[in-house]
């Protein structure tokens, strides 16, 4: 498989020779929940080949909270969640007085919740087509905010079908062919959650991810186009244990019958929206007084590194310490069938506190230097990297083009 990736790199370089310099192509691939150190846990020849023949980072630092929706959207907008609007997988919008949940299709297709200029919108503004086989924000109800080609999220669609569709997009006539493509895989996040990041199930999922990467590269190398492949993940995974001490019970620290307190609980953090602003201080004091294995913040106390000063974040925010998990009531388990004492996984913790929240970054292609390693960086900097490869001028963003300019071939 190492030979496959080397041939791929050579073929795309030839396709982008001095006498013919078409606009490059970028495929952005996400393996959900792929922790920064997973590649070292197994024999992953395709990832390791990219380490030698392309560029990679020590880790990809997610935005706070290190959750799926905020971070996938940060990657394609170059904005912190507090600036693009998706502040968590679940949150309350005080303006509309409604709950946003990632499994609510009405919310996830509503342009109201999605700020910034996603890469597919930037591509369209510059005359380039784009495509997405799943990505947060890619299926909005307003057509001009979507990629030219997209699929509504359906986890039942096999990984092989997803790869085949990406290949078909690259084989379209030039006038119809997308120059920017996103591709999403839900593994190894599912296995990391259900069995823990150190489990054999997760290791097998890592191997499957490596195999999918090899299949994708093998297919791309047969297409004579200057394709750059960027492989990322949205976050890592922390190991927890199914024991009573792991859980922080909301009903023990908060009056859950108080309808004037709206709660959006994400497990690793919990947003509290207080209807009466004059009660914020008293509720804060009460929750803080009971603090064990968690911290509580008023919005004005949020760490500046979060860039989280937005009404969509709670008036108060409870954050679990790494290794602990917030639940609504006693005897709540991660999974009903989980055995006492066994492992499961969680994410969402402050990435500045636990390195296990870091994801991955790999890149290979004619516009990427070979054998280049960079230190861990925040995922908002991927946006200007892709824009630079495609020759696009970015709008005002949080990402900095200088962070990754050292991996680009000039």
Predicted features and spans:
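His/Asp/Glu-rich, glycine-adjacent segments
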Residues: 79-196, 288, 292
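Active-site neighborhoods of enzymes that stabilize oxyanions during catalysis
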Residues: 264-373, 377-385
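Acidic/histidine-rich catalytic neighborhood
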Residues: 226-227, 235-275
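Sec-dependent N-terminal signal peptides
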Residues: 2-14
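Beta-strand elements within well-structured catalytic alpha/beta cores of enzymes
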Residues: 23-35, 49-51, 75, 123, ...
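A long, amphipathic alpha-helix that forms part
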Residues: 159, 163-171, 188-229, 386
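Short, structured active-site-proximal loop/turn typified by the sulfatase FGly-forming signature C/S-X-P-X-R
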Residues: 39-84
């Amino acid at each position: 498989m190492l030979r496959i990736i080397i041939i791929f790199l050579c073929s795309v370089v030839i396709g982008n020779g001095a006498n013919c310099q078409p606009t490059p192509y970028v495929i952005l691939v996400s393996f959900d929940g792929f922790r920064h150190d997973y590649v070292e846990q197994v024999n992953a020849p395709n990832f390791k080949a990219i380490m030698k023949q392309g560029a990679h980072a020590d880790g990809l630092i997610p935005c706070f909270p290190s959750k799926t929706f905020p971070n996938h959207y940060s990657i394609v907008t170059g904005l912190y969640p507090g600036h693009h609007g998706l502040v968590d997988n679940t949150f309350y919008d005080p303006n509309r007085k409604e709950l946003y949940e990632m499994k609510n299709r009405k919310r996830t297709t509503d342009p109201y919740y999605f700020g910034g200029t996603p890469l597919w919108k930037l591509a369209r503004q510059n005359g380039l087509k784009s495509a997405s086989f799943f990505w947060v924000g890619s299926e909005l109800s307003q057509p001009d905010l979507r990629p030219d080609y997209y699929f509504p999220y359906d986890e039942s669609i096999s990984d092989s079908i997803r790869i085949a569709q990406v290949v078909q997009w690259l084989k379209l006539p030039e006038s119809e062919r997308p120059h920017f493509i996103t591709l999403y895989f839900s593994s190894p996040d599912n296995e990391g959650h259900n069995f823990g990041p150190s489990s054999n199930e997760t290791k097998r999922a890592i191997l499957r991810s490596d195999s999918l990467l090899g299949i994708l590269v093998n297919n791309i190398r047969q297409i004579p186009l200057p394709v750059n492949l960027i492989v990322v993940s949205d976050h890592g995974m922390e190991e927890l244990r199914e024991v009573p001490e792991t859980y922080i019970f909301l009903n023990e620290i908060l009056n859950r019958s108080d309808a004037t307190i709206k709660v959006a609980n994400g497990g690793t953090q919990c947003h509290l929206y207080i209807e009466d602003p004059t009660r914020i201080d008293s509720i804060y004091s009460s929750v803080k007084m009971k603090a064990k294995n968690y911290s509580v913040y008023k919005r004005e106390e949020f760490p500046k590194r979060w860039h989280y000063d937005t009404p969509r974040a709670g008036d108060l925010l409870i954050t679990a310490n790494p290794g602990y998990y917030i639940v609504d009531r006693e005897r709540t388990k991660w999974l009903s069938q989980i055995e006492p004492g066994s492992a499961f996984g969680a994410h969402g913790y402050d990435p500045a506190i636990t390195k296990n929240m870091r994801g991955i970054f790999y890149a290979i292609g004619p516009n990427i230097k070979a054998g280049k390693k960079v230190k861990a960086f925040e995922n908002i900097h991927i946006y200007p990297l892709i824009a630079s490869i495609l020759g696009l001028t970015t709008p005002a963003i949080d990402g900095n083009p200088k962070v990754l300019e050292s991996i680009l071939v000039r």
